[in-house]
Curated annotation (Swiss-Prot):
Glycan-modified residues: N271, N327
Entry's localization field: Secreted
InterPro entries cross-referenced by the UniProt entry: AB_hydrolase_1, AB_hydrolase_fold, Lipase_euk
Protein family according to the UniProt entry: Belongs to the AB hydrolase superfamily. Lipase family.
Cystine bridges: C246-C255
Species, as recorded: Homo sapiens (Human)
Active site positions, chain numbering: S172 (nucleophile), D343 (charge relay system), H372 (charge relay system)
Tissue expression pattern: Exclusively expressed in the epidermis within the granular keratinocytes.
Superkingdom, taxonomy of origin: Eukaryota
Top-level taxonomy: Eukaryota, Metazoa, Chordata, Craniata, Vertebrata
Cellular component aspect of the GO annotation: extracellular region; intracellular membrane-bounded organelle
UniProt EC number: 3.1.1.-
Gene name as annotated: LIPK
Ranges for domain AB hydrolase-1: 78-378
Protein name: Lipase member K
Signal peptide span: 1-19
């Protein structure tokens, strides 16, 4: 894939010399903006905060306190927290046009919208003591995101808004860490009104994602290939490709194949003219250890804590020789689920096995033509998901 993009760069240079591909090559302005700038660009108010976890990680979170047509000084608006998926960031919820982005639609519907970022991504790469240049900083996975990131962020929102509970919307890994957190931390679970799970991932036994190829490699080989720190960060080269190459119609298919390598995509349900915006904010990075945790999940077919590789390390972390399984049947949070029939990450078979384990399932919808990214990028997402999601929130408020 990198060879294809390098070839695209040469073609771009040659094309510019001869005036080739002049049409359709203007970058969207949001491709060169950060999250706050995108929110402001579309006329919405925003606030930025740093949230510090108990283990010292500093997370960047963003708030859209109200919509464009809503006055700021009114009665408190119900808080909604949106949590992105694997190797992604809060930008996922705002990278489409306002009438197609969940964060903006919620704000315009009268909600106080909060956007989270998992440790190690572009907007959450700080620590009280550790340097991101050190392997120690990157010694985390799903376990720490569920144990530290979600409680810190949710408690911060509750304290800031003065509300006792909030709505939680997660996509992909954003659902995984929620299932873990809400099943192991009953006090945190009590603070959730409804858990909206988009493309939920608890087991990946049947996944067809290229991520599965990691399972064929030993940990030693993975660390030789990727190191022991950051996996798939957003680089200056990525930004160049996004804004100078992928904004051109000629290269959109190549770029989309690169961007959606792990998840797949349907060009018929994406606004391909915004591909430069998608690629300029993704991938946003995670830790190699987190990817090893996902490889472990593929191999085991179960949701369990990270296996540290030897019994001594496991004893130190878990007080037992093997990593414990997570029992999501203990989660009592009202849960609504949407999954896709073409999803190669949250495979329909895995979701089918998940449903009976959810103690309080209040809504379920299978969208036959959906793949993994349609839940936040799909052009028909407002009709397929967001309208019903907002109706469920309104019904909760009325009751």
């Amino acid at each position: 894939m990198w060879q294809l993009l390098a070839a695209a760069c040469w073609m771009l240079l040659l094309g510019s010399m001869y005036g080739y591909d002049k049409k359709g090559n203007n970058a969207n302005p949001e491709a060169n903006m950060n999250i706050s700038q995108i929110i402001s660009y579309w006329g919405y108010p925003y606030e930025e905060y740093d949230v510090t976890t108990k283990d010292g990680y500093i997370l960047g979170i963003y708030r859209i306190p109200h919509g464009r047509g809503c006055p700021g000084r009114t009665a408190p608006k119900p808080a909604v927290y949106l949590q992105h998926g694997l190797i992604a960031s809060a930008s996922n919820w705002i990278c489409n046009l306002p009438n197609n982005s969940l964060a903006f639609l919620l704000a315009d519907s009268g909600y106080d919208v909060w956007l989270g970022n998992s440790r190690g991504n572009t907007w959450s790469r700080k620590h009280l003591k550790l340097s991101p240049k050190s392997p120690e900083y990157w010694a985390f996975s799903l376990d720490e995101m569920a144990k530290y990131d979600l409680p810190a962020t949710i408690n911060f929102i509750i304290e800031k808004t003065g509300q006792k509970r909030l709505y939680y919307v997660g996509h992909s890994q954003g659902t995984t860490i929620a299932f873990i957190a809400f099943s192991t931390n009953p006090e945190l679970a009590k603070k959730i009104k409804i858990f909206f799970a988009l493309a939920p991932v608890v087991t990946v036994k049947y996944t067809q994602s290229p991520m599965k190829k990691l399972t064929t490699l030993s940990r030693r080989v993975v660390k030789v290939l990727f190191g022991d720190k950051m996996f798939h960060p957003h680089t200056l080269f990525d930004q160049f490709i996004a804004t100078k190459v992928c904004n051109r119609k000629l290269f959109r298919r190549i770029c989309s194949n690169f961007l959606f390598t792990l998840s797949g995509f349907d060009p018929q349900n994406l606004n391909m003219s915004r591909l430069d915006v998608y690629l300029s904010h993704n991938p946003a990075g995670t830790s190699v250890q987190n990817m090893l945790h996902w490889a472990q999940a593929v191999n085991s077919g179960q949701l369990q804590a990270f296996d540290w590789g030897n019994s001594d390390q496991n004893m130190m972390h878990f007080h037992q020789l093997t990593p414990p399984l997570y029992n999501i049947t203990k989660m009592e949070v009202p849960t609504a689920i949407w999954n896709g029939g073409q999803d190669i990450v949250a495979d329909p078979k895995d979701v089918e096995n998940l449903l009976p384990q959810i103690a309080n399932l209040i809504y379920y919808k299978l969208i036959p033509h959906y793949n993994h990214v349609d839940f936040y990028l799909g052009e028909d997402a407002p009709q397929e998901i967001y309208q019903d999601l907002i109706i469920l929130m309104e019904e909760y408020l009325q009751n």
